[in-house]
Amino acid sequence: MAFKFKTFAAVGALIGSLALVGCGQDEKDPNHIKVGVIVGAEQQVAEVAQKVAKDKYGLDVELVTFNDYVLPNEALSKGDIDANAFQHKPYLDQQLKDRGYKLVAVGNTFVYPIAGYSKKIKSLDELQDGSQVAVPNDPTNLGRSLLLLQKVGLIKLKDGVGLLPTVLDVVENPKNLKIVELEAPQLPRSLDDAQIALAVINTTYASQIGLTPAKNGIFVEDKDSPYVNLIVTREDNKDAENVKKFVQAYQSDEVYEAANKVFNGGAVKGW
């Protein structure tokens, strides 16, 4: 038994050593990078960046997909990935404040306008008093949605609320709308809910069910939106060669053309 224990211990130590060596090599490899993206349309765009990175810069990009907005920053902070490309600055700022992450933006990608969608109405004139309106529940996209609802005249918010208003900041609601906060991935499905008259949905999730702002949105965020998406890394690897190569690959004409195709003209260049 003692012999077996020593053998297992030795093997375990060897495996641990190899794992550590592998991690060290991967972190220093300027020709490999792991990037977190949201599954769906943004993943398709990132796959074009992946090809450009390989063809132009000899960089192997390993895409790691996520289904929500929370895990990509957690994985990046833990070192499970080297970068992510999915969020805008207000969301990143809120994450840094709430979770204490040491993350930093290293490049812009696109503005993906949010829009109001419905399977019940075709214009805001048809929206009935007391209707339920679904919005994302994370603080930054909730604020973004409320600001858009204000812009189209459905509600009025307190003065000076900035980019992060909540439903508590609604001071006028002439149609007595009921604001329903949902997880962002649930919003496309909410359109089939008999109780939901309208949903404000991020382009990433809307595209998963074939909707685009320009074609299907009842109202759409302006193109001068401050919510440009970012490529984000940790502070300790922001100047790494693999990061620089990936940013160059993403900010290419090929990726811009791909984004416009995937989002049917709904992607606005942010660099």
Curated annotation (Swiss-Prot):
One of its GO terms (cellular component) is plasma membrane. It holds the Pfam family Lipoprotein_9. It comes from Escherichia coli O157:H7. It comes from the Bacteria. The keyword Protein transport does not apply. One of its GO terms (biological process) is amino acid transport. The gene is metQ. This is D-methionine-binding lipoprotein MetQ. PROSITE patterns: PROKAR_LIPOPROTEIN. It is a lipid-anchor.
